[in-house]
Amino acid sequence: MHMTIQWFPGHMAKAKREVQEKLKLIDIVFELLDARIPLSSRNPMIHEILGNKPRIVLLNKADMADETVTEQWIAYFERQQLHALAIDAQTGTGIRQIVSAAKEMLKDKFAKMAAKGIKNPRPMRALIVGIPNVGKSTLINRLAGRNIAKTGDKPGVTKAQQWIKVGKEMELLDTPGILWPKFEDEEVGLKLATTGAIKDTILNLQDVAVYALNFLKQHYPERLKERYSLDDIPGEIVALFDAIGKRRGCLVSGGAVDYDKVSEIVLHDIRTEKLGRLSFETP
């Protein structure tokens, strides 16, 4: 399958420009990634866009990711001199660490301000960046403690930018995520589709399910057996589709397996943790 998907709505090009304009107002950036696919959910231009602005990497949806793998990712980012935290904006895991980690990172800057005689330094100003559907709005709501940002499960739901107070110590600028103009890497697109970061209408659903099942077969075979009551996992991917389809009653007239329906079921099960905590990338 050839993948050169143009998925770069006009508001994203604008967001990139706006992020670079707003960096002048910002003390620190929170780079929000999906803990299950930290590299695939990362904008490849992020270093160029953010320059040397202080940054904390937040591995969101960590409660859905394989804990052992998430620990490896935290170590990976630390080796790159990037402080990383495992969080889950939906459940609240790790949220309290965010403000204290930012304070720690900015303490020298604010100490200098105090030394200059600024008695009541302003709140830290932070910017959250991330691709669509990685949980930016949910994180803002969690940090602000009230329902401000519009959240939804449809990618690209956040459009406008706004400042939001987080207690007395921080102000947050919410900005729509930035996704690269095209996926050079086919696997990146498939991972984003598997986790629901891009709309199901963008890629062929069966292609995504084939990718996901091949991955699960290799890395989480016992979960597959348990979820779909399989005695063993067939070698051929079509046979695996057939086995799941028969177990789940996904049949069309004449008794053939409905592969689209099987694809929907498998992807829904992945996204709703019916197969447990999964990570689709390791460092």
From Swiss-Prot:
It is found in: Cytoplasm. Keywords: Cytoplasm, GTP-binding, Hydrolase, Nucleotide-binding, Ribosome biogenesis, RNA-binding. Residues 16-181 form the CP-type G domain. GO terms for cellular component: cytoplasm. GTP binds at N60, K61, A62, D63, N133, V134, G135, K136, S137, T138, G177. GO terms for biological process: ribosome biogenesis; translation. The keyword NADP does not apply. CDD domains: YlqF. The keyword Ligase does not apply. GO terms for molecular function: GTP binding; GTPase activity; RNA binding. Required for a late step of 50S ribosomal subunit assembly. Has GTPase activity. Binds to the 23S rRNA. Belongs to the TRAFAC class YlqF/YawG GTPase family. MTG1 subfamily. PANTHER family: MITOCHONDRIAL RIBOSOME-ASSOCIATED GTPASE 1 (PTHR45782:SF4). This is Ribosome biogenesis GTPase A. It comes from Geobacillus sp. (strain WCH70).
